[in-house]
């Protein structure tokens, strides 16, 4: 029993020992991979794989290895090389390098490289040694030597250690250059010695080449040295001029200017002065100069000589030879430049003078010289008319312009304009507002020559050469050559004798060329006047007058149409019919009489009815016949259809329809209203007075005009009733009833006499209402 208990104790002790003893078991590679994979999936572990994928490492350990590589490489490590050495992807290396640089102020990340302060101190020592050897160094040289950015070298290396490791100073004018004080002293000594030995002007570049000093240092130290001379500028081609030489130059220039009052740039440049203009300004700071291309003229010479002579020339109406008052060594180009510059600077009007080969002519002198040419232009114009030359010229220009008009129409064929819209409305059979009025060029199928030579142009016709038409196929017409009635040779013959007396006959052709175009235009204008004065041109004037009259009537119809559209449909139809029977009939008569005149038909009665116009149209030429007949039919149709028919007639007559200018509508309406008011003041017949008053009130209230006869007065009063107060309506209604009573009663009856007395008493009130009523007093909204 005791042995069993001992056995139990022994087993318990073994069991306890087994529990307390740690057992080391070696896992297989597969198990390790599975464990690591599981940890990665549960994001309990972060590792970085190598490029071959066989190994991995934690980011912290990789960071330590990057720092070790930085230390091994002497404080400067290229991340690409580190990536190859550690066999880790470059992007991982760059991320950790940025973290290292951010966490450690002594480490810098520069262009894919890690650089620590030890390396910076090392290159600072190298820079200091180089600066001591050379005396001067620039950041660009250091950037090339150390393969580092210039900004990094300047701010984090040189400027940071300047005065500590690097013994030198920074150039104030160029912060990217550094030098030692000893170097500056050596440069000063070289410059001082070189300048002391110079006795004549010499290029600064030559001096710098001899003494081996940089140009920027030379110019910065020059003022400190205070040499016995001066440098012309800080540019590449500057010169050093000793004071003794500069004094000799100044004496010569001063002496020459005092004697001649001008200076030549070439003479100054021969003295060794490169910029003559700047030297003159510097040498004579209180003098005013007129700087030309080759010379500089003093203000004394310009004011006292040239300007005075020009003023005298203008006052005496003569000419001035500038070569006699300017220095003899000035060329013709110099003299012309003097004249042009004086005209600009002195604010003179160049049109008062004419410059030719060194001689200035006043305009009155030339006008007197060419005075005989006016008679020449008159005689040439008469000869052109008598010989038919001008008429032939007009015919050619007429044909050329018609060709241009045809081309313009072809180009406009594809455009949808207001004519198309109106044509659609007319075809739909709806009456209403026309949209006529745009300016459209039309051409006849027959060449109309109104008069002997188709006088289709004004006196402006003799301007430039007419341009050829631009057809779609590329064909172009030949340009019409301008008519030359007065030629240069004709003017030369007239003025040569006068110029020979002054010894200026060599200028006869240039002077004649100046006035050829002027007198030719004068002759053409005179020829046009003579041409228009002939009986053949009366038809052209009639054409223009008819065209203007028709356009005016069409504009009136358009404005009246807006007013009648405000009425109910039944009243509107009657107003349209009345409008066409009155104004439309007038348009038909005007065009029918014009066409009859074109076709050489005799018309005894000018007030034609529809049958007479139809009969007349049958006798006209075929190109007019259909259009006139259609226009007569359109009088019984809508306004749109009538306007389209009228447009066709105008086209056959080579007339244009003026473009609608709605900005002028208000002016036309206001003018129409003023005319009605004037008639109202002069009217004493009750029925007409009421008619005029109703039309005026309608225009004031609606802003539109109306063309209506007396039978529409009641409809007009009914339309405007809502815009008048009770007293005004009662006045008009009472006056209307009295007018009807007078019209219905016999003239001599007591009823008629009594009604006339009442009308006479109320006349002043009706007139005042029509004259003084304004839209501001309208009780209802318009």
From Swiss-Prot:
It is an enzyme of class 2 (transferase). Pfam families: E3_UFM1_ligase (PF09743), UFL1 (PF23659), UFL1_C (PF25041). Residues 405-478 are annotated as: Disordered. Its EC number is 2.3.2.-. Keywords: Transferase, Ubl conjugation pathway. InterPro entries: Ufl1 (IPR018611), Ufl1-like_C (IPR056761), Ufl1_dom (IPR056580), Ufl1_N (IPR056579). E3 UFM1-protein ligase that mediates ufmylation of target proteins. GO terms for biological process: protein K69-linked ufmylation; regulation of proteasomal ubiquitin-dependent protein catabolic process; response to endoplasmic reticulum stress. Belongs to the UFL1 family. One of its GO terms (molecular function) is UFM1 ligase activity. It comes from Drosophila sechellia. This is E3 UFM1-protein ligase 1 homolog. The keyword Transferase applies. One of its GO terms (cellular component) is endoplasmic reticulum membrane. The keyword ATP-binding does not apply.
């Amino acid at each position: 029993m005791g042995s069993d208990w001992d056995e139990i104790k022994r087993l318990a002790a073994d069991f306890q020992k087994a529990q307390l003893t740690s057992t080391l078991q070696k896992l297989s590679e597969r198990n390790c991979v599975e464990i690591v994979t599981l940890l990665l999936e549960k994001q309990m572990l972060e590792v970085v794989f190598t490029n071959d994928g066989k190994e991995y490492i934690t980011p912290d350990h990789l960071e330590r290895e990057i720092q070790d590589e930085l230390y091994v490489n002497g404080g400067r490590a290229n991340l690409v090389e580190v990536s190859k050495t550690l066999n880790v992807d470059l992007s991982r290396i760059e991320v950790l390098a940025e973290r290292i640089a951010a966490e450690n102020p002594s480490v810098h990340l520069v262009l894919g490289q890690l650089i620590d302060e030890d390396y910076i101190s090392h290159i600072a020592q190298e820079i200091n040694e180089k600066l001591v050897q050379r005396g001067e160094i620039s950041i660009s040289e250091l950037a090339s030597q150390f393969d580092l950015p210039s900004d990094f070298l300047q701010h984090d290396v040189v400027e940071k250690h300047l005065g500590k490791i690097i013994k030198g100073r920074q150039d104030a004018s160029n912060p990217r250059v550094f030098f030692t004080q000893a170097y500056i002293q050596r440069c000063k000594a070289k410059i001082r010695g070189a300048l002391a030995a110079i006795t004549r002007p010499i290029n600064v570049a030559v001096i710098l080449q001899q003494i081996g000093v940089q140009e920027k240092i030379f110019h910065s130290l020059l003022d400190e040295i205070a040499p016995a001379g001066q440098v012309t500028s800080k540019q590449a081609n500057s010169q050093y001029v000793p004071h003794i030489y500069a004094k000799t130059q100044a004496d010569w220039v001063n002496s020459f200017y005092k004697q001649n009052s001008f200076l030549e740039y070439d003479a100054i440049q021969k003295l060794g002065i490169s910029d003559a203009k700047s030297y003159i300004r510097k040498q004579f700071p209180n003098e005013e100069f007129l700087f030309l291309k080759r010379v500089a003229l003093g203000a004394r010479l310009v004011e006292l000589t040239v300007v005075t002579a020009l003023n005298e020339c203008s006052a005496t109406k003569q000419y001035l030879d500038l070569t006699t008052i300017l220095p003899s060594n000035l060329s013709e180009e110099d003299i012309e430049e003097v004249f042009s510059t004086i005209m600009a600077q002195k604010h003179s009007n160049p049109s008062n003078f004419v410059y030719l080969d060194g001689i200035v002519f006043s305009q009155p002198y030339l006008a007197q010289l060419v005075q005989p040419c006016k008679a020449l232009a008159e005689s040439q114009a008469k000869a052109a008319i008598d010989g038919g030359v001008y008429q032939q010229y007009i015919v050619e220009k007429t044909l050329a312009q018609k060709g241009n008009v045809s081309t313009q129409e072809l180009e406009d064929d594809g455009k949808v304009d207001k004519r198309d819209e109106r044509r659609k409305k007319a075809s739909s059979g709806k009456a209403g507002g026309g949209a006529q009025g745009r300016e459209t060029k039309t051409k006849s199928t027959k060449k109309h020559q109104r008069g002997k030579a188709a006088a289709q142009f004004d006196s402006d016709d003799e301007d430039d050469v007419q341009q050829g038409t631009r057809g779609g196929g590329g064909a172009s017409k030949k340009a019409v050559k301008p008519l030359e009635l007065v030629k240069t040779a004709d003017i030369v013959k007239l003025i040569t004798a006068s110029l020979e007396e002054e010894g200026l006959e060599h200028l006869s052709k240039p002077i004649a060329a100046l006035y050829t175009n002027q007198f030719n235009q004068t002759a053409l204008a005179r020829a046009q006047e003579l041409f228009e004065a002939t009986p053949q041109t009366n038809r052209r004037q009639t054409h223009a007058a008819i065209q203007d009259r028709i356009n005016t009537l069409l504009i009136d119809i358009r404005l009246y149409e807006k007013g009648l559209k405000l009425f109910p449909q039944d009243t509107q139809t009657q107003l349209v019919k009345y409008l066409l029977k009155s104004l439309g009939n007038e348009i038909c008569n005007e065009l029918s009489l014009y066409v009859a005149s074109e076709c050489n038909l005799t018309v005894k009665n000018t007030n034609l009815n529809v049958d007479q116009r139809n009969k007349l149209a049958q006798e006209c030429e075929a190109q007019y016949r259909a259009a006139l007949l259609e226009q007569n039919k359109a009088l019984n149709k809508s306004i749109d259809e009538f306007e389209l028919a009228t447009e066709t007639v105008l086209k056959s007559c080579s007339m244009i329809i003026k473009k609608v200018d709605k900005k002028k509508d208000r002016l036309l309406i206001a003018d129409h209203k003023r005319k009605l008011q004037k008639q109202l003041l002069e009217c004493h017949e009750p029925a007409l007075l009421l008619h005029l008053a109703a039309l005026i009130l309608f225009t004031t209230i609606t802003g539109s005009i109306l063309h209506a006869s007396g039978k529409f007065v009641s409809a007009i009063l009914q339309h405007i009733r809502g815009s008048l107060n009770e007293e005004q309506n009662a006045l008009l209604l009472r006056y209307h009833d009295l007018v009807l009573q007078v019209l219905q009663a016999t003239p001599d009856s007591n009823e008629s006499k009594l009604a006339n007395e009442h009308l006479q008493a109320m006349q002043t009130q009706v007139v005042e209402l029509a004259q003084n009523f304004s839209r501001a007093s309208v009780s209802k909204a318009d």
